Amino acid sequence: MTGMRIAFVLGTVTGGTGAHVAMLARGGQARGLAVRVYGPAQAGRQFFPGAPAFVPVEIADRPRLARDAAAVLRLRRLLAGSRPEVVHAHGLRAGAVAAFALAGAGWRRRHRCALVVTVHNAPPTARPAGAVYAVLERIVAHRADAVTCVSGDLAARMRHLGAADVGLAIVPAPPGTAPGSEEVAAARAGLGGAGRPVVLAVGRLAPQKGFATLLAAAASWQHREPGPVLALAGAGPLDQMLRAQADASGIRMRFLGQRGDVPALLAAADVVVVPSRWEGQPLIVQEALRAGRPLVASRTGGIPDLTGEDAAVLVPPGDVAALVAAVLAVLDDPGLAARLSEAARARAAALPGEDAAVDAALALYQRVAGLPTAV
């Protein structure tokens, strides 16, 4: 496999997708692959700073005909120069751009190049974006040699659309070190939870994350004494809306902003809540399991595959009453909290890590490129 040429393509990304591509690129290079990464300059600065293997291609975050056409033409020229054996695109927009770039590549008639697409997110359904993404899904399903998905529901959807070779991607949380006791104590003090239980949520302040549902749930437990403190770590477009919701409801909470000490925050919390409308293999769930924290999360996407039925209390997404009941059950029952913590650590120990993710990707590259795979 040494010297096998792999091109990664990504669009406008935040958080997990960019980190995942960077992990695969590093792992591939460490195993002797010749790697190139194509994507927006913003992604390069955030996830590939100073990497000579990164080449800017501006793939827009929403449909823009002129920019999309320019991205296809630029990527086609770049791929003609590097002639990869496998192109691995991440996301539906990047997958469609890569498919069109390869469709017009004359060099593919002489040099085989396979297309792999990883679907990281559930597409929007509301029009007009939903109609556009439905087309992108079909392009990916019919033109990719293989499709990997971050959850079983996405994989089933791609099979339904006609994709012939569909599997599950492995998207592990990066390895981390446990915070020290002093760091945890400082985090706990900063959460304002002296004498009160702390409910923690972490994520981008965006509609998908379901934080408006969490704040509605928090309004229901304000009458309790000692009432829980809700701490929300993250930044994003809904910041002001969520602050207004908290003020209007009189919620006892702390907006923490973007934080670099999430492991300490997790260790300081009494319960971690992931109220998302949909998720694939969210890093925060994996990090909470690794920290052994009692977890309440939405039963959606790939979350149940990560937690199983014993390492989290799973509730329907958007169900305020169920979320309230689950959080209070954990806070009021030390035995339940202890069982969740023990199951979380066991579950985390069984989850595949970065080496497994890279090995699985490389085995897929060999297969779609028609190369012999190791037995």
Label every model-predicted segment:
Residues H142-G167:
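A short, active-site helix/loop in glycosyltransferases that binds the activated sugar's phosphate group
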Residues E309-A321, A329-G335:
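Conserved acidic donor-binding segment of nucleotide-sugar-dependent glycosyltransferases
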Residues P294-A297:
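Short hydrophobic beta-strand element within catalytic cores of glycosyltransferases
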Residues A89-G95, V119:
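Short His-centered aromatic/hydrophobic patch
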Residues Q258, R277:
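Aromatic "clamp/platform" in nucleotide-sugar-dependent glycosyltransferases that forms part
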Residues G3, A7-A69, L78, R157, ...:
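N-terminal strand-loop element at the rim of the active site
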